Amino acid sequence: MCGIFGYVNFLVDKSKGEIIDNLIEGLQRLEYRGYDSAGIAVDGKLTKDPSNGDEEYMDSIIIKTTGKVKVLKQKIIDDQIDRSAIFDNHVGIAHTRWATHGQPKTENCHPHKSDPKGEFIVVHNGIITNYAALRKYLLSKGHVFESETDTECIAKLFKHFYDLNVKAGVFPDLNELTKQVLHELEGSYGLLVKSYHYPGEVCGTRKGSPLLVGVKTDKKLKVDFVDVEFEAQQQHRPQQPQINHNGATSAAELGFIPVAPGEQNLRTSQSRAFLSEDDLPMPVEFFLSSDPASVVQHTKKVLFLEDDDIAHIYDGELRIHRASTKSAGESTVRPIQTLEMELNEIMKGPYKHFMQKEIFEQPDSAFNTMRGRIDFENCVVTLGGLKSWLSTIRRCRRIIMIACGTSYHSCLATRSIFEELTEIPVSVELASDFLDRRSPVFRDDTCVFVSQSGETADSILALQYCLERGALTVGIVNSVGSSMSRQTHCGVHINAGPEIGVASTKAYTSQYIALVMFALSLSNDSISRKGRHEEIIKGLQKIPEQIKQVLKLENKIKDLCNSSLNDQKSLLLLGRGYQFATALEGALKIKEISYMHSEGVLAGELKHGILALVDEDLPIIAFATRDSLFPKVMSAIEQVTARDGRPIVICNEGDAIISNDKVHTTLEVPETVDCLQGLLNVIPLQLISYWLAVNRGIDVDFPRNLAKSVTVE
């Protein structure tokens, strides 16, 4: 949901054309997150300011438009921007916007500027909750707004505080100015700011919205971390001016040590990571982004910012400052990590869509989730990220699983096996509802958070809620370095690989497997459950090959969509036991990708109202794979066929009990252990949703109104 990308080159000659191309490529890698408009800002040319004695400044070129990145790319071509100018130090920023404040219109697109000259330029993800009060205050100070967005308030706050400082005879550095602005913001943000007052500099900061910095150098960095500079370590500790002040009139009121007009505050130290062997400046490129996918083509060396971090880049250095004071136990460094991601993983290859590619990657992603974690010969599960916490989790009073969307369905799908193997009560919560109810959480609870991105806003807020109450927290995520993976006590990385399509497919099956492995690891030492334990592990061993068998149904499913489902307006999915979660997940896929109304129904509730919808015209998909509830599912199918319904039945291969003269058709899948059957049953539904969308001419990877990473509430 929205995407930020910034590019900084220092002592690396780049033409303006190359810089623009880097920004556009970065935005293209962010498209999958969902957006409705895009824009970039780069340096223009030296311009004289007649209102300031013809003082020269570097103006900025801001180009933005509604629609796709390819529309922005064409607009840049149409505007015939001079691409030949060479820069050895330059900051360019770019953004894809998903509308929250203000409609998708050009004036609401990012980047936003502080004033007509563009003294400060900002791109921002998140929601500023006090923007109405800020806007009212800034209007009272004479600022003129061009958009309806909350982000424009941030840009104007930068100019407002800059002018106050200059009026007081102080020239603050960009980091200190950023702190003053952040002091006034409420809500969530990930933002970048550049200014012609600070050429070649950029500040990036985050609170509740992801931001990382990629580092590319020819020489090896001296250390693989960057020191965090806390307030007590810094030479200048400004007393933050409040927006309700009438305006500071002296440096003392602003809390600064006075410096000569026009002279920047002294910078007395250099980051250890960027010291060169010969003490000469090191050529370096920085890539600031909200997503690793946009950085991996340039570098695999990345630093993930924490909430309240300020990344200040200038003179080829990256400095990390804190917008808040140091608390006990807080880390004093930010590690520079190596991304475990390859460029080909975020390319479509021979497939038409990312979703299709990711559906067919599931044999590999399922295997990768288990690789190195299950000893199939001795039937032992070892999850390194949980190993030291298992004894604590086994003693907990209850397990609370908290997630959103598809991740919520993976929790529902595995709740029963958790309860069976651990004999610990398990509840499954939607993160937003959990927060709305302010559900009681205790110190002896274990709260399990599941998220593909690890940045889902509702889940992160629920995580913070549980941490405040002293609960043990576990993260099940697909993104190393994400907020959730850093804030939880322990967890499991599902190793599904990058998932670009908005509709989650391989992440669902990998989450499902990871949760089953979690349940197995909790019962590793149980003698009474040894037989069940071994049965499930042997079943997991066969899952990748069985998924390959299910994928062979694609042509049959494609024909089924063409002949029976394309023109339908609604669809019911019936499931019971382990397959109720599969029905819900299938219904969600069909809704979000094909725009067809679909509903997952618990088969046991059929006679409590749902039967009123059944007739010969309503398409129904029923799950009738073999488990302990099979007779009850067959009873539900009989109730449907008795009312002229002709369901599509997903059953096990060679199951002769289902009469073909009563049902519309059958989709046969291999038989596996009851608690794993949902891994195979969900794949026909993924294919149905995909082919329905393709047949309707829908952009499968970018369904309307949806975003991959939901980073706002």
Curated annotation (Swiss-Prot):
Domain Glutamine amidotransferase type-2 as annotated: residue spans: 2-316
EC number: 2.6.1.16
GO biological process, any: chitin biosynthetic process
Catalytic activity: D-fructose 6-phosphate + L-glutamine = D-glucosamine 6-phosphate + L-glutamate
Ranges for domain SIS: 389-528, 561-703
Superkingdom of the organism of origin: Eukaryota
CDD domains reported in the protein's UniProt record: GFAT, SIS_GlmS_GlmD_1, SIS_GlmS_GlmD_2
Catalytic EC class: transferase
Annotated metabolic or biological route of this protein: Nucleotide-sugar biosynthesis; UDP-N-acetyl-alpha-D-glucosamine biosynthesis; alpha-D-glucosamine 6-phosphate from D-fructose 6-phosphate: step 1/1
Gene3D superfamilies in alphabetical order: Glucose-6-phosphate isomerase like protein, domain 1, Glutamine Phosphoribosylpyrophosphate, subunit 1, domain 1
MF terms in GO: carbohydrate derivative binding; glutamine-fructose-6-phosphate transaminase (isomerizing) activity
Intrachain disulfide bonds: none
Keywords: Aminotransferase, Glutamine amidotransferase, Repeat, Transferase
Active-site residue list: 2
InterPro entries: GATase_2_dom (IPR017932), GFAT_N (IPR047084), GlmS/AgaS_SIS (IPR035466), GlmS/FrlB_SIS (IPR035490), Ntn_hydrolases_N (IPR029055), SIS_dom (IPR001347), SIS_dom_sf (IPR046348)
Task of the protein: Involved in amino sugar synthesis (formation of chitin, supplies the amino sugars of asparagine-linked oligosaccharides of glycoproteins).
PANTHER family: GLUCOSAMINE--FRUCTOSE-6-PHOSPHATE AMINOTRANSFERASE, ISOMERIZING (PTHR10937), GLUTAMINE--FRUCTOSE-6-PHOSPHATE TRANSAMINASE (ISOMERIZING) (PTHR10937:SF0)
Quaternary state and interactors: Homotetramer.
Protein known as: Glutamine--fructose-6-phosphate aminotransferase [isomerizing]
Organism for this UniProt entry: Candida albicans (strain SC5314 / ATCC MYA-2876) (Yeast)
Record gene name: GFA1
